[in-house]
Amino acid sequence: MALLCYNRGCGQRFDPETNSDDACTYHPGVPVFHDALKGWSCCKRRTTDFSDFLSIVGCTKGRHNSEKPPEPVKPEVKTTEKKELCELKPKFQEHIIQAPKPVEAIKRPSPDEPMTNLELKISASLKQALDKLKLSSGNEENKKEEDNDEIKIGTSCKNGGCSKTYQGLESLEEVCVYHSGVPIFHEGMKYWSCCRRKTSDFNTFLAQEGCTKGKHMWTKKDAGKKVVPCRHDWHQTGGEVTISVYAKNSLPELSRVEANSTLLNVHIVFEGEKEFDQNVKLWGVIDVKRSYVTMTATKIEITMRKAEPMQWASLELPAAKKQEKQKDATTD
């Protein structure tokens, strides 16, 4: 019976009886994500593309490992007994002070409000990167490589979550089990947008079996595919919500981010002809006039000022709440 190898960067299935000291090629280090660059602590290679990161060949050989890494242990919280709680109660007379009434929530504005383009703030790093691209664009046109359909033995599949490598013509007929979505890292949790099996352990995330079946993608063909997915994340403070879109070398003159109090439309052109589009029905209400966009060489940050200082349960309004808001609007 074939077992799954849990060594980082391997993910292959192996026969325990034929497992040898050099059967596995893996990474002994840990994944490193810094300034949109992804790599392994044991290797010097870095990339901005998550699929390329997953396909980085291991730098160490050893035996396959079938032992699944343990999930991080959560500390056990013990409650004291009722008897102890009674003893902890103060013996003096308590004076209860009533808290002030909470501020009434702002009524949700209509989604049909006119959209406004948010202010774009362009960083010096992006300006320098775009200037370099303009200088080298003329030379690159003369140095374009001719399309070559030949696939080299050992080429990794570019589909997310697939660890298969090209072994010959028979690999063209194999069924690829992969993740059709994009990886999401939020508040310590890691998961794919297509199946949302969340985990806090990176090795378990890499070992998650795909949720979609199709053909292997041995080469990336961006030609003719303008609209592409981008890894994006969000976080919040008491007064602001920030969305980070990891798109490199975005073009300010072709990009736009527009919003009203409850809707956000994002259109970003980056790396030449790639486009990213996202429309979000916001969970809360924002102050459009005090919201803005910061564009850097490695990402775009959309900073939205909250209309009221409250914690958002999520970035996007759930489908059930959307229907309730629509019903309220029709009855009014």
From Swiss-Prot:
Which residues are reported to carry the modification Phosphothreonine?
T47
Q: SUPFAM superfamilies in the record, alphabetically?
A: HSP20-like chaperones
Which residues are recorded as binding Zn(2+) 4? H179, C194, C195, C211
| Residue numbers binding Zn(2+) 1 | C5, C10, C24, H64
* Superkingdom per UniProt: Eukaryota
> Region labeled Interaction with HSP90AA1 and HSP90AB1 — which residues?
65-316
Which Pfam family is one of this chain's hits?
A: CS
Q: Its GO biological process terms?
A: centrosome duplication; chaperone-mediated protein folding; regulation of cellular response to heat; regulation of centrosome duplication
Give residue numbers for the modification (Phosphoserine): S51
InterPro entries on file? CHORD_dom, CHRD1, CS_dom, HSP20-like_chaperone
> Residues annotated as region Interaction with PPP5C?
2-77
Kindly list the positions annotated as binding Zn(2+) 2: H27, C42, C43, C59
Give all N-acetylalanine modified positions: A2
Q: Which residues form a coiled coil?
A: none
* Gene Ontology MF terms: ADP binding; ATP binding; Hsp90 protein binding; zinc ion binding
Q: Residues in domain CS? A: 227-316
Domain CHORD residue range list: 5-64, 157-216
Q: Would the keyword Metal-binding turn up in this protein's UniProt record?
A: yes
* Subunit composition and interactions: Interacts with HSP90AA1, ROCK1 and ROCK2. Interacts with HSP90AB1 and PPP5C.
What's this chain's function? Regulates centrosome duplication, probably by inhibiting the kinase activity of ROCK2. Proposed to act as co-chaperone for HSP90. May play a role in the regulation of NOD1 via a HSP90 chaperone complex. In vitro, has intrinsic chaperone activity. This function may be achieved by inhibiting association of ROCK2 with NPM1. Plays a role in ensuring the localization of the tyrosine kinase receptor EGFR to the plasma membrane, and thus ensures the subsequent regulation of EGFR activity and EGF-induced actin cytoskeleton remodeling. Involved in stress response. Prevents tumorigenesis.
Q: What is this protein called?
A: Cysteine and histidine-rich domain-containing protein 1
Lineage of the species this protein comes from: Eukaryota, Metazoa, Chordata, Craniata, Vertebrata
Identify the gene encoding this protein: CHORDC1
